[in-house]
Structure formats: structure tokens, C-alpha cells
């Protein structure tokens, strides 16, 4: 007869399913474990299998596997089964690990907008991740949104004032902007007229403004219209004419003290402060001390046409005077060009016709430089005259400078050379600086002549070209006559000679660097080698001197010829040095051989 057992499954430490089985009491506890696993799998096919760890009685005592079931558990007794879940096997042999938490789902899932779908593999109802959002009207906990509409008073309840929003601009465009601006400006003007009369205890101004006051200040409202946000009229922008108002000139500035009413930014307030009537009067009085930036800004102002013609005429005349002052202030003056002569570089001055050939030779041999200084503090009168060099009419400048020089020369106070030397433009000076001193008549001369045509008169250019041609012809004649060379201390202005004789030091450097020996071009390498070998044989073989007398005479003739053609001494030639090294090496080898023989 089989006994009835009530099984309570504890899987992974949690209470699980409960079921009953009929079991043979003569069987062991180990067989009971196998029976429980098979029954659990048959009852719950969609859940993970269990592996029984231990079986206990009602008092939670552990029971060994060797005991019989009838001895421990009577009929209808409670059996506690401790187990852990094992993964399921798929058809392909792979394991699936299930947990009970992932399988559980609410019964009212459809009411909570969860759609359950049937799994294709094992039929488990899984929760679909797609959820439809409920309508906002059905949400009872919907919070009321705050109203961000700007209020006239920032301290009124139920509204949030945001001073940094776009609507706080002074010239914002909206459907009700005109009415709102009229209201707020009327409040501000009312506050100016009676700052304490209509103010309440909490700081809110009374809004009872009459229509007449708004009409009186219509000019102030029209200047703030968004159609013309950047153009202002000096005469009408601050014209607030009110018979009952005794406010001073700073009344428009007091309207800016409340940004919550006029909603004007710091940049607009700064502009109104800088362009107030008092500031404009002060600016016209101190126009000489204002920097360039303020002058530019004052000339850029564009006045708007107004019905008052007198004010328009005054503004136009003041703008014209401001422009003239700015042009005089920003006039660019060219630096004064002063040409002086010192004794270090060739002079760029043109010699006169009365100079003789001796004076021409002296000017060619001597050296002078042209120093250009742009400091107007040395002589203000002459520098003012010289600053006009860049003007279009340069002939008048030449006449002025020549007359100035003649006047100073009569008084004995002349500090500058004659006008023929002074009237040299920067182009001719740069050309003269780049021109080599020893090549007169080259291409640079023609370039400098062409450049100087714009500033030097034509007569002076003709004289200059004639003198240069005469000087060049004289230098060529002197070169053909073979005149003695001038000393090296003075820089020579003659043409370089085509055939130059190099010095001894230069030849020695060339011989050490490039060629082993400088010899006559007619001698070939083979003849030079044969001559050197014959010379060595003549020196070494003294016994055969009588037999080779003819060859030695030829050798001496060749050596004398070579010595005449080569200015380097024999002892300093590269071939002689190499031969001496070879001889020393041979002697050393012979000495070593002798020592080896002795040993």
C-alpha cells in the first residue's frame, strides 16, 4: 500500500509550487528525489527543471538518502524539498536558463497598456516592450503650467517675470506693442512728474494716466517706434515739451531707472546717456581732445527729417563742420626727406658743368653717403616745404625749395645742399643705393634716370646724362692708356679689369683646395709626370750623372720654365710635399727592415 506525501518545493530559496504524490514506503529517500523531479517536470513543462538538494521533514530535519520512506514519513505527511533551478534543453541541444521573475506578468496587463504576445519557441507569454502612451487628458495628476506672460508689475502673483527674454527689448515688434509701449512710457513719465504722489506702499505706480498726458508725449513715443530703430534726430529725440513739467535736462535719463517698465537694455541706456543734449554740447566744445573713434561715430550720425527746418539746418551745418574738423584732424603728412652727404659712400648728387676733369676724378675716388631723416623737429620750415614733395605739382615745390635755399645762403644760415642735390625722390635714392659704385653706365643708370624723370627737371637730367657719358669715356681712355692703379684704401669707381693677376696668398689657397699643382696649360699630365720622375732619378743617382747629362739639362730647362709659370715655390707645392712623404715612408720602411734583420 502506497503512502500519500504532500510536497512543498523551495526553489532557489523561494517558495515554489506544491503538489502531492503517492509513493512506495519501502523505497529509499534517493528514489523519492528522482520521483519528485520527474513529477515536477510533467506538471510544469514551461518552467525550468529542479535539481533536489535535500529533503526534510516538517521540523526541517535533514534525512539521509539510505533511509526508507515508510520509516520517516507516515501517510499524509508534509515533505519539504530544497532545490535549485536547472536550464531547459532546446531541440538542438542548447540550454535555456529561465527565471520565474521574467515569466510573471500582471493579469490586468491589457488595462495597463501592455500587450502580451505568444512566444514561438516555448509558448511563454512575454511582455511586449512597445507601450502606447496614455492621453494627457486622462492623467488626473497633471500639473498646471505656469503663465510666462509678462506682467506690468513684476511682483504680481501668478506671473513669472523674465528680464532676459526677447520680449524685454526696447524695440521689440508685436501685435500689441504700440499700446503696451504707450502705457509703459506714460507710467514712466507720470513717475517723473510726480515720483511720490501716485506711488503705493508696495512700490506699484498708479495706472490712472489721462489721455492728454499721452498725447503730450507723443513725440517721445514716435522716436521709439521699431520702424526706425537706428536713426535718431538730435533735435526731436529729446524734445519732451510739457507745460506742467519742470524737470531738468536729465529727465530722459530718469526714465531709464526702471527697466521693468521701459524694458530697455544697458546698451540703449548707454547710448542715450552719451547722446544726450548736454553730452552733445560738451562734445562740440571739446572736439579737439576727442579721439579718432568718437570723431568717426559723430560723423556717422544720420539725422531724420523733422518739421522744424531750423533744427535741420543747424544739424546739417554742425555735421559739415564736424566732417571738416575730422578731415583736418586725420590729414596724413608725408615725412620730410633730407639728403645729406657724409664721407662713407658714393654721392648721388649731380656735379655741375663748371667742374673740371680733376674734380670729376676727385668725386669718383672720394666716397660719400646720402642719409635720409624724417624728423620734422630739426628745421620746421624746411620740413614743411619738403613734405609737399608727394603733391601733384612738383615744379612749384622745386621753386619753393630753391628760393628758400637762396634766402638762407644769403643770410649764412643754410643747412642743406643746393636744390639740385636736395630734390631727389625716394625712388631715385633707392635706385642709387642698389646701384654698384664701380659700374657707371650700366642698366641701373638707365633705370634710375627713368625713375627720376617724374621729380627732377629735364635740364638737370640732360646735364646728368652728359656728365656721366663724359666720365665713362674718360675712364675707358684711362684704362686703355694703362694708368697706374689707385691705392686700395679708396674704393675704385673704374671698370674692373678683364685680366687680373691673383696674389700669392690667393694662389696658395687655390692650390691647396682645388688642384695639386698650378702649371702652364701647355704642359700635359704625362709630360709633368715624366719630368718629375726624371728629376727624382737625377737627384738619387749621382753615379750616373755623366751618362745622363743631356737629359738633366733638358730637365733643368723644363723646371726653370715651370718655375717661371708657377709662382708657388717648389717646397710649398703639393707634388713636392707628396714626394717628401713618400721618401720618409721609404726610409722608415728601410729602417724597420734593418731592425728586423738585426733581430
UniProtKB/Swiss-Prot annotation:
It is found in: Cytoplasm; Nucleus, Nucleolus; Cytoplasm, Cytoskeleton, Spindle. Keywords: Cell cycle, Cell division, Cytoplasm, Cytoskeleton, Mitosis, Nucleus, Phosphoprotein, Septation. Pfam families: Cytokin_check_N (PF10407). One of its GO terms (cellular component) is nucleolus. Phosphorylated by clp1. The modification Phosphoserine is found at residues 174, 306. The modification Phosphothreonine is found at residue 513. Residues 210-262, 292-599 are annotated as: Disordered. Residues 307-320, 436-452 have a biased composition (Acidic residues). Residues 242-251, 364-380 have a biased composition (Low complexity). Transmembrane segments: none annotated. Residues 292-303, 321-333, 402-413, 483-500, 533-542, 558-574 have a biased composition (Basic and acidic residues). Negatively regulates the septation initiation network (SIN) pathway, independently of the cdc14 phosphatase clp1. May also have a role in silencing rDNA transcription. Required for maintaining the exclusive nucleolus localization of nuc1. This is Nucleolar protein dnt1. It comes from Schizosaccharomyces pombe (strain 972 / ATCC 24843). The gene is dnt1.
Amino acid at each position: 500500500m502506497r503512502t500519500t506525501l504532500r510536497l512543498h518545493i523551495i526553489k532557489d530559496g523561494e517558495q515554489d509550487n506544491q503538489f502531492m504524490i503517492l509513493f512506495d514506503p519501502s523505497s529509499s529517500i534517493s528514489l523519492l528525489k528522482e520521483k519528485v523531479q520527474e513529477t515536477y517536470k510533467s506538471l510544469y513543462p514551461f518552467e525550468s527543471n529542479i535539481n533536489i538538494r535535500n529533503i526534510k521533514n516538517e521540523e526541517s530535519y535533514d534525512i539521509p538518502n539510505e533511509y526508507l520512506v515508510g520509516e520517516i514519513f507516515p501517510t499524509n505527511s508534509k515533505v519539504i524539498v530544497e532545490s535549485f533551478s536547472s536550464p531547459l534543453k532546446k531541440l538542438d541541444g542548447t540550454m535555456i536558463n529561465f527565471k520565474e521573475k521574467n515569466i510573471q506578468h500582471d493579469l490586468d496587463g491589457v488595462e495597463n497598456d501592455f500587450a502580451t504576445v505568444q512566444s514561438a519557441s516555448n509558448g511563454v507569454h512575454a511582455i511586449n516592450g512597445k507601450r502606447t502612451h496614455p492621453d494627457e487628458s486622462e492623467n488626473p495628476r497633471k500639473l498646471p503650467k505656469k503663465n510666462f506672460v509678462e506682467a506690468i508689475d513684476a511682483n504680481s502673483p501668478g506671473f513669472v517675470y523674465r528680464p532676459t527674454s526677447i520680449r524685454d527689448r526696447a524695440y521689440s515688434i508685436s501685435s500689441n506693442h504700440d499700446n503696451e509701449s504707450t502705457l509703459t512710457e506714460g507710467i514712466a513719465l507720470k513717475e517723473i512728474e510726480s515720483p511720490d504722489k501716485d506711488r503705493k506702499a508696495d512700490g506699484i505706480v498708479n495706472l490712472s494716466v489721462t489721455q492728454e498726458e499721452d498725447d503730450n508725449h507723443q513725440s517721445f513715443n514716435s522716436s521709439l517706434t521699431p520702424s526706425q530703430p537706428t536713426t535718431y534726430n538730435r533735435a526731436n529725440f529729446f524734445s519732451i515739451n510739457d507745460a506742467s513739467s519742470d524737470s531738468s535736462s536729465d529727465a530722459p535719463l530718469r526714465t531709464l531707472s526702471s527697466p521693468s517698465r521701459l524694458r530697455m537694455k544697458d546698451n540703449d541706456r548707454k547710448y542715450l546717456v552719451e547722446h544726450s543734449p548736454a553730452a552733445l554740447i560738451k562734445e562740440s566744445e571739446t572736439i579737439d581732445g576727442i579721439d579718432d573713434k568718437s570723431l568717426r561715430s559723430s560723423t556717422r550720425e544720420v539725422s531724420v527729417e523733422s518739421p522744424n527746418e531750423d533744427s535741420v539746418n543747424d544739424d546739417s551745418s554742425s555735421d559739415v563742420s564736424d566732417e571738416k574738423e575730422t578731415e583736418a584732424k586725420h590729414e596724413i603728412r608725408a615725412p620730410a626727406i633730407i639728403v645729406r652727404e657724409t664721407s662713407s659712400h658714393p654721392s648721388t648728387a649731380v656735379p655741375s658743368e663748371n667742374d673740371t676733369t680733376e674734380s670729376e676724378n676727385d668725386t669718383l675716388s672720394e666716397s660719400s653717403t646720402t642719409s635720409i631723416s624724417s624728423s620734422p623737429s630739426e628745421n620746421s620750415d624746411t620740413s614743411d616745404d619738403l613734405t609737399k614733395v608727394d603733391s601733384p605739382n612738383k615744379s612749384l615745390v622745386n621753386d619753393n625749395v630753391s628760393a628758400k635755399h637762396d634766402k638762407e645762403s644769403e643770410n649764412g644760415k643754410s643747412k642743406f645742399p643746393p636744390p639740385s642735390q636736395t630734390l631727389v625722390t625716394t625712388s631715385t635714392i633707392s635706385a642709387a643705393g642698389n646701384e654698384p659704385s664701380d659700374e657707371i653706365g650700366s642698366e641701373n643708370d638707365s633705370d634710375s634716370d627713368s625713375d627720376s624723370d617724374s621729380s627732377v627737371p629735364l635740364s638737370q637730367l640732360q646735364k646728368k646724362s652728359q656728365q656721366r657719358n663724359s666720365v665713362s669715356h674718360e675712364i675707358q681712355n684711362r684704362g686703355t692708356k694703362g694708368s697706374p692703379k689707385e691705392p686700395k684704401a679708396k674704393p675704385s669707381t673704374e671698370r674692373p679689369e678683364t685680366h687680373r693677376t691673383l696674389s700669392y696668398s690667393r694662389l696658395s689657397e687655390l692650390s691647396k683646395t682645388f688642384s695639386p699643382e698650378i702649371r702652364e696649360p701647355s704642359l700635359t699630365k704625362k709630360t709633368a709626370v715624366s719630368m718629375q720622375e726624371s728629376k727624382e732619378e737625377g737627384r738619387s743617382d749621382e753615379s750616373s750623372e755623366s751618362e745622363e747629362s743631356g737629359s738633366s739639362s733638358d730637365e733643368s730647362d723644363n723646371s726653370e720654365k715651370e718655375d717661371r709659370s708657377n709662382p708657388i715655390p717648389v717646397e710649398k707645392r703639393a707634388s713636392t710635399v707628396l714626394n717628401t712623404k713618400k721618401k720618409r715612408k721609404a726610409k722608415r720602411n728601410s729602417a724597420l727592415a734593418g731592425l728586423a734583420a738585426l733581430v
